[in-house]
């Protein structure tokens, strides 16, 4: 722990500083980002021995165990007689990884490593976040979820079913860790843009929490992935003999709501009222109402609504430095009116209000197109969210017509309709404005509204492009090269989570997501903008997440949202002291000796 924080930084000891969870860092060391070179590993006492050590991914070091550790832990002979540093272990993994032909095979290798040696897994991820993020999360995680029956190797996370209702507290007691600080939960009904994958959706919470640690430094032993299995309406899965979930239609209504209510209460009863619960990939009908139902009662947020909103608004704020005007000068057309679209729209309204625009005027700057066309006043069966953005305008059937009529400065695709941004739409956008904003945010890549290459080619390099999934750099005929910005939620949720955990925040207001968007936009340099980037390089994401966490923590104390007191004087030092390190611990016994005269053997 950082000495500058001292004893009594809190009224009670910080919960969950498990052995091996802290980086070897001191506040007096020179600032070197999130990855200052660690000092010697301190000995960590273990009660486990033998196979209980080598088969525990939190403890296993493979051939990095020293001879002394092997002898003391009773594992000598259970490991080959070879001694490797973590650097060499990383090299072995990388060489094997590079031999794989498919991304799915690479995903399986990494997940198998996570099940075997957790520290090495995170050493691999943090060695090149930009390289490995598309494998452990979008777009490859979508493919892994579709084939989860084949890729499933070892249970990771907690599977809770509708038939366990009334016994969720008992099920949570089955989890081996008691000091959980973050839960990511899904019911598998709307996995990315792939639809209802039921129990196969567990790949999403597992992947998200891997990024909590790799990008945000949250201790993985304090994270819990949860799949709520209430059935699936995917007939293909119901017929599949390899499907690992409940084989019946989805349960809705009161029984579903009762399960969610019990789950939320059981989590907070077990892990505390400030345990963070992130909702992920719930269907639109449930996502909004559950967010509104729980947001002021529990420490929770919905990443598809609020996380996506934050990263999208961050990209828009960065784009303003290219268009050289204010947010209030822009008009937005959305392809899609689901969770992501509504989340972005609401945060845009908040940003416009902060700029001084009245709310009614701000909503008129946002036009939404769903499967039935432009959302207009008087249209039947509009839900509350859509009514807020319904325009006083005659009905318009297609996105192309809406773009032609409205002449927006920005189009944002979040409907998972591949190719929705046609060449005609892109040409129109380029004719209306010198620097049109074009965000194709749908995941995975196969569902993107347009490719980066198509956007830059049709707009002759004038389009300001961002996507939800990664695209390679694009070089036009004139030799100009663009590096597309990826609006990945991983810029948001790891840093927000670290800040929320650090402050013991009990409720997460939308202001935190606007603050996060502003911080991400500030991280983009002029050089990045000249390359077409609207987001900082993924290689810097751990440092970005750290600064977001510090901002969140500072905001929490200023607005009386934090529950841990006294307030840390040096918030950066405090947050850094919580960051997980993949460096191995030492498991040798604490050995020392007494003065010789004190050990004289008494005789008769």
Swiss-Prot record:
Residues involved in a divalent metal cation binding: 280-281, 304
Tissues and organs where the protein is expressed, per its UniProt entry: Expressed predominantly in organs with a low-division rate.
UniProt GO cellular component terms: mitochondrial matrix; mitochondrion
Cofactor note: Divalent metal cations. Prefers magnesium or manganese.
Segments for region (Disordered): 29-50
Entry annotation: catalytic residues: 137, 208
Cofactor: Mg(2+); Mn(2+)
Gene Ontology MF terms in the entry: malate dehydrogenase (decarboxylating) (NADP+) activity; malic enzyme activity; metal ion binding; NAD binding; NADP+ binding; oxaloacetate decarboxylase activity
Main localization category: mitochondrion
One GO biological process term: malate metabolic process
Keyword annotations: Metal-binding, Mitochondrion, NADP, Oxidoreductase, Phosphoprotein, Transit peptide
Subcellular location: Mitochondrion matrix
Site (Important for activity): 304
Gene3D superfamilies: Malic enzyme, N-terminal domain (3.40.50.10380), NAD(P)-binding Rossmann-like Domain (3.40.50.720)
Residues reported to bind NAD(+): 190, 304, 443
Pfam families associated with the record: malic, Malic_M
PROSITE patterns: MALIC_ENZYMES
Residues with Phosphoserine modification: 371
Domain of life: Eukaryota
Coiled coil: none
Keyword Hydrolase assigned: no
EC id: 1.1.1.40
Disulfide pattern: none
Family note: Belongs to the malic enzymes family.
Role played: Catalyzes the oxidative decarboxylation of (S)-malate to pyruvate using NADP(+) as a cofactor. Can also reverse the decarboxylation reaction, but only with significantly lower efficiency.
Protein name: NADP-dependent malic enzyme, mitochondrial
Species annotation: Homo sapiens
